[in-house]
């Protein structure tokens, strides 16, 4: 039988299989078993009571986390004229139109988020095969195709997260770093859940938020007692 590493043994000793954790306890367990040499992200998986086979039950949106994600985000904006100036003033890292499109086609994807003014979609529309598979294609539903590019840039820089249900009806999202205090992680999670509930499809039946699981990059997944959350 293979011997457990020290890290895995620590996880095995501190995590009770099948237990549903109060949210504060869940974060404290993740912190206690974190022993890697980098600052892990804290992620959440939310199982929703939707039928992922039905397009009208797909859940897609964006949430500005009150305490951000702990990540530095590079933002590219497709815009011109006054919109381009507003994007730069708001802190965008790269702004352009056809020139930025040429960079993307050349494989220069030096950004984490792409925002587009509506009149820039003639350029962005040609980049779907490049941006789409990377989750970077701007979309009105996530606020990344908008006439107010300045606000979109500020939101992205402030720690906005974008999400959509996968083939199993699950939302996956980062809610911060393991170095955040538990209260900040909890508030980020509650902000996400509040927005998810606003996005509930009218055709979804039964329990909407079925299960919440939090985990760290290299840590275990812990089921969360929803009654310990405000959202």
Swiss-Prot record:
Gene3D superfamilies: 3.30.190.20, 3.40.50.790
Alphabetical GO biological process terms: regulation of translation; translation
Keywords from the UniProt entry: Repressor, Ribonucleoprotein, Ribosomal protein, RNA-binding, rRNA-binding, Translation regulation, tRNA-binding
InterPro entries listed in its UniProt record: Ribosom_uL1_bac-type, Ribosomal_uL1, Ribosomal_uL1-like, Ribosomal_uL1/biogenesis, Ribosomal_uL1_3-a/b-sand, Ribosomal_uL1_CS
GO molecular function: rRNA binding; structural constituent of ribosome; tRNA binding
Example of a GO cellular component annotation carried by this entry: cytosolic large ribosomal subunit
The organism's place on the tree of life at top rank: Bacteria
SUPFAM superfamilies per UniProt: Ribosomal protein L1
Function noted in UniProt: Binds directly to 23S rRNA. The L1 stalk is quite mobile in the ribosome, and is involved in E site tRNA release.
Similarity comment text for this entry: Belongs to the universal ribosomal protein uL1 family.
Subunit structure and binding partners: Part of the 50S ribosomal subunit.
Protein name: Large ribosomal subunit protein uL1
């Amino acid at each position: 039988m293979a011997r457990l590493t020290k890290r895995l043994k620590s996880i095995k000793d501190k995590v009770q299989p099948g237990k549903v954790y109060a949210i504060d306890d869940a974060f404290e367990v993740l912190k206690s078993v974190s022993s890697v040499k980098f600052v892990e992200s804290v992620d959440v998986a939310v199982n929703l009571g939707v039928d992922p086979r039905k397009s009208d039950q797909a859940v897609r949106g964006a949430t500005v986390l009150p305490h951000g994600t702990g990540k530095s985000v590079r933002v590219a904006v497709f815009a011109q004229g006054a919109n381009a100036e507003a994007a730069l003033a708001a802190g965008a890292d790269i702004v352009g139109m056809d020139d930025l499109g040429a960079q993307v086609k050349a494989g220069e994807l030096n950004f984490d988020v792409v925002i587009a003014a509506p009149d820039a979609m003639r350029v962005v529309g040609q980049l779907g095969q490049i941006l789409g598979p990377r989750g970077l294609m701007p979309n009105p539903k996530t606020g990344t195709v908008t006439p107010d590019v300045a606000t979109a840039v500020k939101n992205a820089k402030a720690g906005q997260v974008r999400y959509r249900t996968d083939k199993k009806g699950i939302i996956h999202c980062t809610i911060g770093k393991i170095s955040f205090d538990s209260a900040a992680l909890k508030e980020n999670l509650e902000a996400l859940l509040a927005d998810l509930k606003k996005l509930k499809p009218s055709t979804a039946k039964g329990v909407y938020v079925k299960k919440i699981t939090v985990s760290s990059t290299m840590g275990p997944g812990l089921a969360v007692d929803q009654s310990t959350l405000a959202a």
